[in-house]
């Protein structure tokens, strides 16, 4: 089997027993399957849920808590137990697990975003297996990923993974809920995530987790946009993970299965940055950006809004509709001076060295509303 990197997301429903508590037996089964991949030369990053499940009974809850404060308290107790279970299980097979706890703010800050990428690559280089979870005990509602499906998609992008595997207790994606409709049709392969399918599938979560099938499809959509192919399905058994990479997985494969990926810089721009302002451009500039792969020059700028500086991320509009985001080489004040001018005139006025308002290497088109 060829070498590569995959991200495996293991949800709470795949890690818990009938009472919703952490099942060490089930966890070790997943670890054994992951180690089988490592033996074959595959780099693996694990995104795991289960901290709440591991901790809630130890602080007196008789069932999985539902309020944010209760879940954060349970996660504070359970995260160390969950990680210890992973470390013990991987150690049995001669591997070292490495814990990373992430929040949405880690991705929003460009320096921290870069550090995540560098740390993951160094861990893989050293033969460790990164085990990632959201930092549930400190995340506030506005800064959460929503669920680990989304987190796993973002991780797959930052590491340029070959595949994202979203393991669940359902064996793939159906056109209807198979529990309600005996005639539900299973999709074995989808090149993309159709909006019509997103409208039909359930957003319901399991009793032990936060992500339903809709969450997984949204994560798949994000991963595909980032250049990572996706598998959604069953993840039980030692050979299961290998079967998935061989195209024999019990589930649904999603994506174009090409090698086209989005650069880490562009990932941060489109999925994580907060625009400091915006500009409106003309039709010629829109064509240059969207169809010809060119940079944006001052001549195509009509107006600017906000209070931004050179180096900030700004949103670009055409006909009052957003078409993308990019890093500006000019401040808002400078753009007001040079909008509509040719490049030589603009450089003469601003004394800048760069001709482009937004260079194509720091531009990302957003043709329609993305899943972030």
From Swiss-Prot:
Reaction(s) this enzyme catalyzes, per UniProt: L-glutamate + ATP = L-glutamyl 5-phosphate + ADP
Start and end residues of each PUA domain: 276-353
SUPFAM superfamilies: Carbamate kinase-like, PUA domain-like
GO molecular function, one term: RNA binding
Enzyme Commission no: 2.7.2.11
Subcellular location, principal: cytoplasm
Keyword line: Amino-acid biosynthesis, ATP-binding, Cytoplasm, Kinase, Nucleotide-binding, Proline biosynthesis, Transferase
Signal peptide limits: none
Localization terms from the record: Cytoplasm
Binding site for ATP: 9, 168-169, 210-216
Highest taxon above the source species: Bacteria
Pathway: Amino-acid biosynthesis; L-proline biosynthesis; L-glutamate 5-semialdehyde from L-glutamate: step 1/2
GO terms for biological process, alphabetical: L-proline biosynthetic process
Keyword Glycoprotein: no
Gene Ontology terms: cellular component: cytosol
Positions bound to substrate: 49, 136, 148
Record keyword Membrane present: no
Listed NCBIfam families: proB
Function (record text): Catalyzes the transfer of a phosphate group to glutamate to form L-glutamate 5-phosphate.
Family: Belongs to the glutamate 5-kinase family.
HAMAP family registered for this protein in UniProt: ProB (MF_00456)
Name under which the protein is recorded: Glutamate 5-kinase
Organism: Shouchella clausii (strain KSM-K16)
Gene this chain is encoded by: proB
């Amino acid at each position: 089997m060829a070498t590569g990197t995959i991200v495996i997301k293991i949800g709470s429903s795949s890690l818990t027993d009938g009472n919703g508590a952490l099942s060490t037996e089930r966890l070790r089964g997943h670890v054994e399957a992951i180690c089988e991949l490592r033996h074959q030369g595959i780099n693996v990053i694990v995104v795991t849920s289960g901290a709440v499940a591991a901790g809630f009974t130890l602080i007196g809850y008789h069932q999985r808590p539902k309020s944010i404060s209760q879940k954060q308290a349970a996660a504070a107790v359970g995260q160390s137990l969950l990680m210890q279970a992973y470390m013990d299980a991987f150690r049995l097979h001669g591997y070292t697990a490495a814990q990373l706890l992430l929040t949405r703010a880690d991705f929003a800050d460009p320096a921290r975003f870069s550090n995540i990428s560098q740390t993951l690559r160094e861990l893989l280089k050293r033969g460790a297996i990164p085990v990632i979870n959201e930092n549930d005990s400190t995340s506030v509602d506005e800064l959460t990923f929503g669920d680990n499906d989304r987190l796993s998609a973002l991780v797959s992008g930052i590491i340029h993974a070959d595949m994202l595997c979203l393991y669940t207790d359902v064996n793939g994606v159906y056109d209807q809920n198979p529990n309600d409709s005996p005639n539900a049709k299973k999709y074995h392969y989808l090149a993309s995530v159709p909006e019509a399918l997103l409208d039909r599938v359930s957003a319901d979560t399991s009793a032990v987790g936060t992500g339903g099938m809709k969450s997984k499809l949204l994560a798949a959509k994000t991963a595909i946009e980032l250049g990572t192919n996706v598998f959604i399905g069953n993840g039980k058994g030692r050979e299961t993970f290998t079967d998935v990479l061989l195209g024999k997985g019990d589930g649904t494969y999603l994506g174009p299965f090409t090698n086209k990926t989005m650069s880490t810089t562009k990932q941060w721009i489109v999925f994580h940055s907060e625009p400091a302002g915006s500009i409106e451009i003309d039709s010629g500039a829109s064509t240059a950006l969207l169809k010809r792969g060119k940079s944006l020059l001052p001549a195509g700028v009509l107006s600017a809004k906000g209070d931004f500086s050179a180096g900030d991320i700004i949103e670009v509009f055409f006909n009052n509709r957003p078409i993308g985001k990019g890093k500006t080489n000019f401040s808002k004040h400078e753009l007001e001076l040079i909008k509509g001018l040719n490049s030589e005139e603009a450089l003469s006025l601003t004394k800048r060295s760069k001709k482009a308002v937004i260079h194509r290497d720091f531009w990302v088109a957003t043709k329609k509303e993305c899943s972030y």
